[in-house]
Amino acid sequence: MNWRNVAEEISEWIGDYANRNGIRTLVVGVSGGVDSAVTSTLSAMTGIDTMVLNMPIHQDESQFDLSGRHIEWLKTEWGNVSGEVLDLSSTYDEFRSEAGVLSDLSLANSRARLRMTTLYAIAGSNNGIVVGTGN
């Protein structure tokens, strides 16, 4: 299997979908993991404006350093990429304070939902879509 060809086909599919639907911006959350690195790279390859966001919540800088380096690499490789760090710690703290006593599991899930809400809000404000890391 020629992985470069596969990557190009997937990137073309993303670009075609965006163009057919009038989408001008692709928004991807990056965590420093493989899934988000691949998804953000495929999105950047489309040539469509791609916003790549790192959204730490009470994380040590070393924990999200990989995503920061990946964002910088994308920006140097493709001129259509913008990226930034949005520290959601204070937003999460306010939610936790207002919500009262919550289980550890619900708190873990709330971090993912806060990041998801942020991605969709930014995509909606930029005539874009969120490009997820799932199938």
Predicted regions: what is each one?
Residues 1-135:
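ATP-dependent adenylation/nucleotidyltransferase module used to activate substrates
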